[in-house]
Curated annotation (Swiss-Prot):
Homodimer. Its cofactor is Mg(2+). GO terms for cellular component: cytosol. Keywords: Hydrolase, Magnesium, Metal-binding, Nucleotide metabolism, Nucleotide-binding. HAMAP family: Non_canon_purine_NTPase (MF_01405). It is an enzyme of class 3 (hydrolase). NCBIfam families: PRK14822.1 (NF011397), RdgB/HAM1 family non-canonical purine NTP pyrophosphatase (TIGR00042). Mg(2+) binds at E40, D69. This is dITP/XTP pyrophosphatase.
């Protein structure tokens, strides 16, 4: 079994990615378990931030690293909150505070203009000096609901409505979510590439 460090401090992402990766026989260790501090996210895109995080974890641990950078892009807000999704309402904002700020920003936006996409970029870095890290992008289209619904998931899941399923992301089972989510898509692309390598 190959040990890989997961370069994130977000407990929701750790749970979700560790569960998915364990299904494929990968020994995933969260960077927090190895005493690795979070990398500073100074990039302007999901790709830049994911590469920064993966390289930092690989340099600190000497292990291959997987990093995720993801967020919500809302059409009516010009793609915001985007790379600032986790800190939309402030640096130490809770999921609930971020969600409330987003709903307030969309208060007068009609249903047909509430389109949004979750984006996930996964980076697999074989070692800290890897000149060609593997980069995978998953995108999940939906609509921002007017009110939260559901208790599963994390972040914006309670207001991310998936018309094709008739539910918010927070109303989906783990299996349903992984089959269609941005993170599930990016992970499938990554695992397919690793199998073929």
């Amino acid at each position: 079994m190959q040990k890989i460090v997961l370069a994130t401090g977000n407990p929701g992402k750790v749970r979700e990615l560790a569960n998915l990766l364990a299904d494929f026989g990968l020994d995933v260790v969260a960077q927090t378990e190895l005493g690795v501090e979070s990398a500073e996210e100074t990039g302007l895109t999901f790709i830049e931030n994911a590469i920064l995080k993966a390289r930092h974890a690989a340099q600190t641990t000497g292990l291959p690293a997987i990093a995720d950078d993801s967020g919500l892009a809302v059409d009516a807000l010009g793609g915001a909150p985007g790379i600032y999704s986790a800190r939309y309402a402030g640096t130490d904002a809770s999921d609930q505070e971020n969600l409330e700020k987003l709903l307030a920003a969309l208060q007068n936006v009609p249903e047909e203009k509430r389109g949004a996409q979750f984006h996930c970029v996964l980076v697999y870095m074989r070692h800290a000096e890897d000149p060609t890290p593997l980069v995978f992008h998953g995108q999940w289209p939906g609509v921002i609901a007017h009110q939260p619904a559901g208790a599963a998931g994390f972040g914006y899941d309670p207001i991310f409505y998936v018309p094709a399923l008739g539910k918010t992301a927070a109303e989906l089972t783990r299996e349903e979510k992984h089959a269609v989510s941005h993170r599930g898509q990016a992970l499938k692309l990554m695992l397919d590439a690793l199998r073929d390598a």
